[in-house]
Amino acid sequence: MRYLQVKTTNLYDESGKVSRMVGSIEDVTDMENDMLKLQKEARTDLLTGAMNRAAGTSAINRMLVQELHPGCVNTFAIVDLDNFKTLNDVMGHMWGDRALCEVVLIMKKHCRAQDIVCRLGGDEFVVFLPDITREVAEESLRVLSAKLHIDYVKENLEVMISASMGIVFSDGRDITFQELYEEADGCLYQVKRTFKGSYHISDRAGREKAD
């Protein structure tokens, strides 16, 4: 796609009326592409290609005020990798970076086009599934959890990483990213304390359950 910039100037006669117009057309494709690239980089985690924290927070807050279809909820999940520090320590940071990129690729391929995958920092991510039924959301995240059990082997070394998730279902519009994060973080704490590699769900409508 080419971007063209059109500039016009009015020329006036002695009475002050417009007598004619002259203009120029300039190809600004390179400048426009550079601007689009900078805008994308401002929203993107450069290592993994996921949304960065600022962009993810903003996008999720915008979605939270939108009307939901009957029977649907917004689903907010913190995804925290298990044994990631061990992978870094045993195999080196290049393997850790590789794991982060592979995890994001798996999450992006698994999620719907309207879903958000956001890297908060380190090995912590948010997956946001807007306007979805509880049953479909839980099944989707259960399958994703299974996909994120990844075995890394280097010579005689082997490290298995997995993903623990704290999940919140919300059906109201009077809530923010930060409030959902704090509640999901409490669910994540339960998982980390009991059985890593699984998930715990808090339903703001009043139900709680674990896998």
Question: PLM features: what roles do these ranges have?
Answer:
Residues Q39, R43, N52-T75, D82-R112, ...:
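Conserved long alpha-helical elements within nucleotide-processing catalytic cores of c-di-GMP signaling
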Residues R119, E139, L148-S164, K192, ...:
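Catalytic core regions of nucleotide second-messenger enzymes
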Residues E26-L36:
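PAS-associated C-terminal cap
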Residues L11, V28-T29, L81-D82, I132:
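PAS/PAC or PAS-like capping segment
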Residues E14, H93, E138, R142, ...:
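Catalytic-core segments of nucleotide cyclases and related cyclic-nucleotide turnover enzymes
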Residues V6-T8, I25:
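Sensory-domain boundary capping and coupling elements
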Residues M1-R2, K17-D27, V159-I161:
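PAS-family sensory domains
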